[in-house]
Amino acid sequence: MNDTWIIVGISMGYLLLSLVMGILPGLKVTKSSEGYVAGDRSMNLLLLYFVLGASIFSSFAFLGGPGWAYSRGVAALYIIAYGTLGMVPLYFFGPRARRMGVKYGYLTQAELLSERYQSPFLSILLATLTVVVLIPYLTLQMKGAGLVLNTISDGQIPYWLGAAMAYVVVLLYVFFSGVMGVGWTNTFQGIFMLSIAWFLGLYLPKELYGGIGPMFEAIQQEGLGNMLLAPGLQSDGSTWSWAGFSSAVLISAIGFSMWPHFFMKTFAAKDDRTMKLTVVLYPTFQLFLLPILFIGFSAILSFPGIVPSDTILPHVLKNMDLPVVLVGLVCAGTLAASMSSGDAILHAAGAVFVRDGLRKLPQLKNSLNQGNVERKVIQLSILFISVLAYYFAVISSTDIVSLLLGAYGGVAQLFPLVFAMFYWPSATRIGALVALLNGIIATLVFLFWPELKPWDIHEGIYGLIINLFSLITVSLITQKTEASIVEKFTHA
């Protein structure tokens, strides 16, 4: 059999196994919205650990991680730094959000915020922003899956078909099983990704240099020691400033747990102990990224001049005499990285669109409360969103990447509102709305006009400063929220 089709066969086998593992768990939960969105609030430590870990590490982990190490050296450690710190807020927010969900039936981040600040408009605004950000994010995962299957088949599987094959599988298990399908497939995919990453991260330095230590020594001896000096390089090859590096880590860490598809998993946790223990153990998931970076470092001398740098892993696989089964498993691992974030994004986008958007419209609220109508509408929304993302992935020429440039800086603007929701009783509805809008606008202004920055720090930091100032000053001069509402959250 042709090597190409052996590799394709391994990838297809992986997709089939993912489908089975995604469909079966959905048979064990109730048919309610709570069962579909939060798994009847029954996720144990193993599931929650992997659903949070695998859902945030997308195809960028397998492609972008090595690319950063290859082109920017130790600047790639930024990814590990913010991932290690990013879960800390959920140690404090997570158990409170979970308890509020159990007591009052909340399933999404925006439901909490709109209730605390007594603003249906805030809910609709957050639903709109969430879908606007998550659709391009999902589109990029589809692009990654299509690229993998197109590359490993030497073009015999068209790009559009590769994306469709992978994401029809994702659509099926998310559509029928909801968050439990996401949870069990992410557990499988997470273990699979960790295994492949560690094997490759140790194998390539050993094969090319004789080990990890000799690899770094060779890079130093070739006059590229600047790539090994913290904080590394910028994309143009110049030295990254500590201010730029530190602010990038800070804003990414703040925004990390604020992603709607990430935050809403707190409502699925079985109990407070599970939530807190997951946060404590979560930094160990960064061990997945360490060998991924070794892959990029191993290619600096062996495969110079590869552009774009994100293609370095496929380039290494195609130009080294690796066993065909290993290449197939690595390709399946890259699919796993794409699917393990894509499924969580797709599920969250559908749930948020209905729970935080359509449900806030008076003319639809009563209809959605009847039987399992809401669950069915969420499923239809998931179908619509997946088709829309597929359109952007393979048909439209729209520059979706530009929509994602300020994503972390933008999503980090939710942090002051979430913090104040639980810990600052004086925060008001008007204060929250003004703060959120001002923070997002400031982030976008400094993103697209960086010459306006007074210092070389991430634009999201400027947004947060303006956000906090607006929240405090406007809240102090506007009407306070009813005490009984505030106490529900501060005493949660």
Where do the language-model regions lie?
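Membrane-embedded helix-loop-helix hairpins and adjacent transmembrane boundary segments
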Residues: M1-A492
